[in-house]
């Protein structure tokens, strides 16, 4: 989490307006989705390109979990990872645990408010090398919101698994509650800065079977 807030978010804000003049279908789709969301929330009329980028910056500062912001963050971070400016931070226990679980034939997947593109870049360019082959699937807010139980049902269906056969790990109690309501097993990850507040907790991936 600290890597996201201390490195990725500042990098996004620093480079955001460099993309204002970029003409691509991908950027246009993000701006169209931004305008649609502004209209739904505020009833605002059509905004120009600069105003839309300013709104994306405002959402970033508010840490809004909205799809167009997450999509643009993924694009900007992708360039940072590809140029080597960014390297994905993972705790020392993560890579060995992923290798162990993968060798045991367990299906590993990620669900994050960050876009699928950003997830793949972070784990594909980590300080421990490319960890992305360990994962069978990646999910983001296009699947649903992280505090909605139906999202976890959809994820289990996508993995062709019963929720009862899935273990969901998170540091956020509200997300754990949603996954539990969907029928998943849950464990809270208690890293530095996180307060233990769940019936099943782990401070290290090595503590998880």
List where the protein language model places each region:
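Conserved phosphoryl-transfer catalytic core
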Residues: 1-58
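Short amphipathic alpha-helical segments
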Residues: 2, 121-124, 180-182
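Metal-dependent phosphoesterase signature
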Residues: 40-92
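Short, solvent-exposed loop/turn segments at secondary-structure junctions
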Residues: 78, 82, 115-117, 173-175, ...
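Substrate-recognition element of Asp-dependent hydrolases with the DxDx(T/V) motif
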Residues: 83-127
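Surface-exposed, interaction-prone regions with an acidic/low-complexity signature
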Residues: 100, 107, 125-145
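Asp-based, Mg2+/Mn2+-dependent phosphohydrolase catalytic module
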Residues: 133-209
